[in-house]
UniProtKB/Swiss-Prot annotation:
Residues 18-77 form a coiled coil. GO terms for cellular component: catalytic step 2 spliceosome; post-mRNA release spliceosomal complex; Prp19 complex. The gene is syf-2. Belongs to the SYF2 family. May be part of a spliceosome complex. It is found in: Nucleus. PANTHER family: GCIP-INTERACTING PROTEIN P29, PRE-MRNA-SPLICING FACTOR SYF2. Residues 1-16 have a biased composition (Polar residues). This is Pre-mRNA-splicing factor syf-2.
Length: 233
């Protein structure tokens, strides 16, 4: 092979290598640009999620569940079926009972004692929700009192014009007895035990000692026994 042929062959080989290098470089550049766009999109999406409320995902799932429930309810109504019954058949008895209890708590939730005003308002809400309108008694009372007195104005004297029915009085008595019973159940104090050991100075200290005994009693039991027996530690 002559020198000229070797030179041309080397030039062609170098050109081929350079071409392959440029192609790989362009491919790497495209991959870099693609990765940059994907990273930018992920950063934008992460920033968008951070700006959303903390309960956004839970609210979104709840909204989707409510939409699905409305659709299922509409389908059941179109088929002439009772949606609550159909849903109960698809769930276990335990789940159905928990959902019913949650629904009742949602209507008038018990958030614990905050103030006497809140407690009174909650009781008022519960009592008014339990009232059933009696149209017959309403009409009779209107006839008995008269239209002018039944819809009073600022100049109307209504003292002594209300005549409760026997059934209404019975409901009142029954409700009062129920309130007393519930009050005894919720606010029942434990009886004093004279034989119980006294290791407290007041009620607050008594509760604190119970908490300590719950978590550290098994570690201090031997020390207490030694102190009571007078054994040297």
């Amino acid at each position: 092979m002559s020198d000229s042929e070797q030179t041309s062959s080397g030039t062609a080989s170098s050109g081929s290598k350079m071409k392959d290098f440029n192609q790989r470089f362009r491919d790497l550049h495209k991959m870099r640009q693609k990765a940059r766009k994907e990273n930018h999109a992920q950063v934008v999406e992460e920033d968008r999620r951070k700006k959303l409320p903390k309960n956004f995902e839970a609210k979104k799932e709840r909204d989707q569940w409510q939409v699905k429930e409305l659709q299922d309810r509409k389908e059941a109504e179109d088929k002439g079926l009772d949606y609550e019954r159909v849903r109960s058949l698809e769930m276990s008895a335990d789940v159905t009972e928990k959902l019913e209890q949650k629904r009742k708590r949602k209507k008038n939730p018990d958030q614990g004692f905050a103030s006497y005003e809140d407690m009174t308002l909650r009781q008022h809400t519960r009592l008014t929700a339990a009232l059933d309108p009696d149209l017959e008694s309403y009409k009779k009372m209107k006839e008995c009192v008269g239209g002018d007195q039944f819809y009073p104005t600022a100049d109307t004297l209504i003292h002594g014009n209300h005549y409760p029915t026997t059934s209404a009085m019975d409901r009142l008595v029954k409700d009062v007895h129920g309130q007393v019973k519930r009050r005894e159940q919720y606010h029942r104090r434990r009886l004093y035990d004279p034989d119980a050991p006294i290791d407290y100075i007041n009620e607050k200290n008594k509760k604190f000692n119970k908490k300590l005994d719950k978590y550290y009693g098994k570690y201090t039991e031997d020390i207490k026994d030694d102190l009571e027996r007078g054994t040297a530690i």
